[in-house]
Amino acid sequence: MKTVTIEDLKQFVFIENPVYAPDGKSLAFIKATVDEKNNGYHRDLYLVKDGMVRQYTAKENTSFVLWNDETEMIISRKAETPGTTELLKLSVDGGEAIPWMALPFPLVKLHKLDNGNYVVIGSVKADEPDAWKVKAQKKEEDQSSCTVVDELPYWMTGSGYINKDRNCLFVIRDGTVDRITGADWNVDETVVDGNRMYYTCSKKDPSICLYQKLYCYDGNTGEISCIYDAWTHSIQNLYIVNGTLYFQASDMREYGVNETGKICTIKNGTIVTVCKPDRSMYNSVASDIALGGGKQRAVMDGALYSLETDEDHTMIVRYDEDGKKTIIKDAEETLFCMDAADHRIAYVSSSPSSLQELFELDVNTGEVTKLTDFNGAYVQDTTISIPERVDYESEGKSLHGWVIKPVGYEKGKKYPCVLDVHGGPRTVYGSSFFHEMQVWAAEGYFVCFTNIKGSDGRGDAFADIRGDYGGEDYRDLMIFMDRVLETYPDIDENRLCETGGSYGGFMTNWIITHTDRFCCAASQRSIASWISFSLIADIGPEFGTDQCGAKKSWDDATFDKLWHHSPLKYIRNAHTPTLFIHSDQDYRCPLSEGMQMMQGLAVQGVETRLCIFHGENHELSRSGKPANRIRRLREITDWFEQHTKA
C-alpha cells in the first residue's frame, strides 16, 4: 500500500451543499475535484434519486442554488462578465440546462416565495445602489485606479475591498428585477415562510456594528415592517417552525463576541428566550479535506435539526419548539453540512480512516446509508495512521489530545515529532483524517494535537480566554507536550517541531518567544502584535480588544493590554528557527503580521524564512489554489526535514 503524500490532494473528492427537493424524494449535491490544468477546482451537480447517484453537469463549475420545485433545479455557473450571475434551470429528468436569468450583480442568495416570485440577495454599492442597471462594460470603464475607504470593515478576507458594498434585497416578478431595500444597511440573514421573508439588517457606520435589526417582507403586498427595532443583539440563524420565527441571539455581555446565542423568538417586539444551547450549533472541527460548505441546520417535522460541536466531534441534535434538546447522532466523526426532509437527514462526514462521503440517516429507524464512495479507492489503497487518544490533567481540567505514530513505526527507534495547534481559538481538533498530519506521519514523524483552554466543544466558559491569551492556553500545550513525551518515549525531545495557523499562528509566535524546547517552528497566517492586528485586520477593531480583554477607549491602558498579549513584545527571547507562511490577500491575519515577526528574528540573527502566497487569503490551507496548497505543505515539511533530519 502507498503512504499519504502532499500530491494526494489532487486525488481527493470534496462534497458540498446537499439539499433535498421539496418532496424529499431527490437529493442534490456538489462534487468538487482538483482542476490541475487551470489550478482550481471543478464543481459538478449530482443527484440522488431512487437510490441511484447520477451526475447532472460536467466540468462547468456549477453551483447549486435552489430547488424550483420537485422536478426542477435552479443552478448558477460562472458568468463571462465579472460581477454578474448566470442562472439556469435544469430538469431532474436530465437534458441541457436552460438559461433563465442573467443578474447584473453578484448573487448572494436566492429564495422562492409561494406566489411564484423570487427574492434575491445581491451585492451593490451604497453610493451607486442602482449601478447594476448599467451594462457591465460601462461599469468597468468607470473603475478608478484609486481605492477610497471611509468605513469599517473596508476589506474582508476572501472578498477584497468591500467599502460601500451592501447586500440588498431584490424581487424577481415575471422576469423583471427590482430592488426593494435601501443600500444604507446590509442584509445579513434570511428565511422564507410562505410569501413572507424575514431578514436581519446591520448598519454600516464608520465603525463596525455587531448588532442587527429584524424585518419582515410581505411578498403579496410588498410591505416591509420592522419587528425588532433595537441595536442590542447579534441575531443569527433564522428558522421557521410551524409558522413561528426562531433565531439565535446574543447580547455578548457575558462572553464577548464568541458568545453562543440563545434560541429565541419575538413576542410583541421583544426578544424572548426559549433555551440556551450548551454547545456551538455548527461544526467547528478543523479540517483540510473540506472545500466548500452547506447547511448547518434544517427544519423537519416541527423541529430544528442542527449540527453541534461536542468536545472533538460533530453531533446531530434536535431542538423542539419548547427548547428541548435530543441527540440524534453522536459518533467519532466530523460532519460538515446537512439537510433534512421526510424523516431523513443527509450529511457529509469524514472519520479517522476516511475522507468526505455523503450519508443518509433515517431518523425513525436510526439506519445509516452510505450514498457515495468517491474517496473509497484512495482510502483502500493508502496506509492511514489512526490517531491514538492521550488523556492528561492541566490546572484542574481533564483534557485529551491525540498522537499519530509514524508510518512503519519501530519500537525503540527515535523519531521527530510535530505539535500542531488549531486556529480559532474557538475551534477544535478531532480524530478525523487530516491531510497534513498524515503526510508528516508518512514522512516519519510523530504528530500530536489537542484541544486546550479556549477551544470549542465544551461551552462558553471553557472557550473564554479573553484577557489571557498566552496564559492558561500556552500552559495547557506545554503540559500536553510533557504528557506526550512521557507516553511515547521513542519521540526524540531534541527534534520537536511546532506549527499552527491563525490562532495557532499566534500561539506559534508565542511559543518561540517563550521557550526554546522546539528545534524549529512554522507559523502560518499568524498574529505578531494585537495593536497592528486590531487596527489593520478585517475583524480587528472588535475582535482584538475583545479577546485581549482591553477597553475600546484606545488610551494607554488599551495599548498596554494589547501589547502585553503580543508575541512581538517578547521577540528578543526568540532563538527558534521559524518559517512564516502568509497570503498577500489575507485580511484576517494580514501579511504585515508575519513580516514583523520575520524581521524581528532576522535582525537578531535567528534563522527565518517568509513565504508569501500571491492571490491567496486566510483559507490557503483549506481552499487555496491547488498548486499553492501543495507548495505551502511542501515548504513546511521541508523546513521540518531541514531541522530534524540533517
Residue ranges and their predicted role:
Residues 4-10, 53-56, 96-101, 177-181, ...:
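A short beta-strand motif characteristic of beta-propeller blades
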